Regions:
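RNA-contacting regions in translation and RNA-metabolism proteins
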Residues: 1-43, 52-53, 57-76
Length: 76
C-alpha cells in the first residue's frame, strides 16, 4: 500500500526525493502520514482537494480486498 501511495504522489510532485511516508498500523486501519515539500503541497492536495480525494479513493479500493480501512493524512 505504501509503495502505491508513493508511486502516485511521485508522479504529481516536482521534488519526488522530498516525499516521506510514515505508516501506522492498527487492527483494521492503516494510517499513512505523507510529508511533501511545501512547494508541492498544492499539487498533492489539488484544487478543492480533488487530487488527494482521488488518491484516497484509489487506495481505499485497493485496501478493500484485505478488509482494511486506509487513512491518508498530509502533514507538514
Amino acid at each position: 500500500m505504501k509503495e502505491l501511495i508513493e508511486l502516485i504522489i511521485k508522479g504529481i510532485v516536482d521534488k519526488p526525493d522530498e516525499i516521506e511516508i510514515n505508516q501506522v498500523i492498527g487492527a483494521k486501519t492503516l494510517i499513512f502520514e505523507v510529508k511533501v515539500d511545501p512547494i508541492d503541497l498544492g499539487k498533492v492536495i489539488g484544487k478543492q482537494g480533488r487530487n488527494i480525494k482521488s488518491i484516497r479513493t484509489i487506495i481505499n479500493a485497493a485496501a478493500q480486498k484485505d478488509n482494511k480501512r486506509v487513512i491518508i493524512e498530509i502533514v507538514n
